[in-house]
Curated annotation (Swiss-Prot):
Family: Belongs to the NrdR family.
Protein's recorded name: Transcriptional repressor NrdR
Organism of provenance: Albidiferax ferrireducens (strain ATCC BAA-621 / DSM 15236 / T118)
Keywords: ATP-binding, DNA-binding, Metal-binding, Nucleotide-binding, Repressor, Transcription, Transcription regulation, Zinc, Zinc-finger
Span of zinc fingers (unnamed): 3-34
Gene that encodes the chain: nrdR
GO biological process: negative regulation of DNA-templated transcription
Length: 149
């Protein structure tokens, strides 16, 4: 594997670990030229369902996009990166378990809201307000009252 620092083609694996959930392998590598270390991850190459938007367009599922939307909702909230990664893993697991080639974006949004509700109620309200396109304060009030119960 090519070194990300100096582009040298020879690197050596110095440590290998299986993730806690057993779904990926983490490898620490060291460059033979510059001696710098870096981490790589190996995961099975699985096909996630295409996401069908409200307007009928089909787009590829993107982990980075999911992570970015959750991170935005969780901005300045006391939730660790590990907790967010765990939530994303659970969402992806559910996507794969659906066993379908296409999934409505609404279903993905519901999965995200369910995970955010477990992680942080404020982040849940933030995400839901954008996802459900709240137009007035009463919609916020209804959701906040629901979360408080």
């Amino acid at each position: 594997m090519k070194c990300p620092f100096c582009s040298h083609s020879e690197t050596q694996v110095v440590e290998t670990r299986i993730s806690e959930d057993g779904d990926s392998i983490r490898r620490r590598r060291q460059c033979a030229s510059c001696q710098k270390r870096f981490t790589t991850y190996e995961r099975p190459d699985v096909a996630f369902p295409a996401i069908v938007k409200k307007d009928g367009r089909r787009i590829e599922y993107e982990r980075a996009k999911l992570l970015a939307s959750m991170t935005l909702a969780l901005r300045k909230r006391p939730v660790s990166t590990e907790q967010v990664d765990g939530a994303v893993e659970r969402i992806e697991e559910k996507l794969l378990m659906q066993g379908v080639r296409e999934l409505p974006s609404a279903r993905l949004g519901e999965l995200v809201m369910r995970e955010l509700k477990k992680l942080d109620k404020v982040a849940y309200v933030r995400f839901a307000s954008v996802y459900r396109s709240f137009e007035d304060i009463d919609e916020f009030k209804t959701l906040v009252d629901e979360v408080r119960r």
